[in-house]
Swiss-Prot record:
<dbReference type="Pfam" id="PF15127">
    <property type="entry name" value="SmAKAP"/>
</dbReference>
<comment type="function">
    <text>Binds to type I regulatory subunits of protein kinase A and may anchor/target them to the plasma membrane.</text>
</comment>
<keyword id="KW-0449">Lipoprotein</keyword>
<keyword id="KW-0519">Myristate</keyword>
<keyword id="KW-0472">Membrane</keyword>
<keyword id="KW-0564">Palmitate</keyword>
<comment type="similarity">
    <text>Belongs to the small membrane AKAP family.</text>
</comment>
<feature type="lipid moiety-binding region" description="N-myristoyl glycine">
    <location>
        <position position="2"/>
    </location>
</feature>
<dbReference type="InterPro" id="IPR027969">
    <property type="entry name" value="Small_membr_AKAP"/>
</dbReference>
<dbReference type="GO" id="GO:0005886">
    <property type="term" value="C:plasma membrane"/>
</dbReference>
<dbReference type="GO" id="GO:0034237">
    <property type="term" value="F:protein kinase A regulatory subunit binding"/>
</dbReference>
<keyword id="KW-1003">Cell membrane</keyword>
<protein>
    <recommendedName>
        <fullName>Small membrane A-kinase anchor protein</fullName>
    </recommendedName>
</protein>
Length: 80
């Protein structure tokens, strides 16, 4: 295996996007379409429990992989 160089230019990597592209955060009021139904408390509770379960599984998977492959040294790329 070898090093993988980024396909972005240094300027794009520093900015984090394409030239002329602007990022902005969207609030919950702006993201909701007019007339769209609101999520009820049951749905919000389900979504919260599901997201917590996903995070727990991801951490368990990371811990297992770290335990299994943690002794393999990381080799950084020295290529220009």
């Amino acid at each position: 295996m070898g090093c993988v160089k980024s396909k972005k230019s240094a300027a794009e990597a520093a900015v984090g996007g394409a030239p002329g592209e602007k990022a902005r955060l969207v609030g919950p009021e702006e993201a909701r379409a007019p007339g769209a139904p609101q999520a009820g408390p049951v749905l919000l509770d389900y979504a919260q429990r599901l997201s917590e379960e996903i995070v727990v599984r991801a951490v368990q998977q990371w811990a297992e992989l770290d335990r299994r492959y943690g002794d393999i040294p990381y080799i950084e790329c020295d290529a220009p």
